[in-house]
Structure formats: C-alpha cells, structure tokens
C-alpha cells in the first residue's frame, strides 16, 4: 500500500475503534468523541480550559443535527485540523 492509502486506512481504523461503544458503530457519540480526542489528539483538548469544548466541537461537526458525528462529519474535522497544521508548519518554515 502507498503512504496515502495507509493513512486513509488508519483514519478509518481510528473512527471504528471509538465508535459503537455507546451506540451505533456508524457514529461517534459525545462521549466517544471525547475519548477519541483525549487519546488520539491530546494536545487539542489539553490546551484549552473550556470545559464545554467537546460540546461546542460536537455542535460544529454535527452537520445533520442528530447529536452524533458520522464518518463524513468526522473526516471534515480531520481535514480541517490537517489543513490548519499544514498552514502552521508552512509559516514556521518547517515544511
């Protein structure tokens, strides 16, 4: 597999690993999203002191209003974070 194919598979695996423990295997609940972020993106929540960060994130990601994050909504989040990191590293001259 190519590097990009491997990366895509890893994103799918991460979503699957955290979805389904509280509800459907096709979506992340608020609790599942929080655990995913704590384990996979610890710096994202750690830097903020806002206790409602996961609630706000869920509201922003939940395009269809079902109080859960499906894979399409999750991948938009991953793409946005990746884009922000890319811009940061370009500005820092680390690319």
Curated annotation (Swiss-Prot):
Homodimer and heterodimer with S100A1. Interacts with S100PBP and S100Z. Interacts with CACYBP in a calcium-dependent manner. Dimeric form binds to and activates EZR/Ezrin by unmasking its F-actin binding sites. Interacts with PPP5C (via TPR repeats); the interaction is calcium-dependent and modulates PPP5C activity. The lineage of its organism: Eukaryota, Metazoa, Chordata, Craniata, Vertebrata. GO terms for biological process: endothelial cell migration. Keywords: Calcium, Cell membrane, Cell projection, Cytoplasm, Membrane, Metal-binding, Nucleus, Repeat. One of its GO terms (cellular component) is extracellular region. Its main location: nucleus. SUPFAM superfamilies: EF-hand. This protein binds two calcium ions. InterPro entries: EF-hand-dom_pair, EF_hand_dom, S-100_dom, S100/CaBP7/8-like_CS, S100_Ca-bd_sub. It comes from Homo sapiens (Human). The keyword Transcription does not apply. The gene is S100P. Detected in all of the tissues except brain, testis and small intestine, expression level is higher in placenta, heart, lung, skeletal muscle, spleen and leukocyte. Up-regulated in various pancreatic ductal adenocarcinomas and pancreatic intraepithelial neoplasias. May function as calcium sensor and contribute to cellular calcium signaling. In a calcium-dependent manner, functions by interacting with other proteins, such as EZR and PPP5C, and indirectly plays a role in physiological processes like the formation of microvilli in epithelial cells. May stimulate cell proliferation in an autocrine manner via activation of the receptor for activated glycation end products (RAGE). Ca(2+) 1 binds at residues 25, 27, 32. Ca(2+) 2 binds at residues 62, 64, 66, 68, 73. One of its GO terms (molecular function) is magnesium ion binding. It comes from the Eukaryota. This is Protein S100-P. Changing residue 64 to C: In S100Ppa; permanently active, interacts with EZR and PPP5C in absence of calcium. It is found in: Nucleus; Cytoplasm; Cell projection, Microvillus membrane.
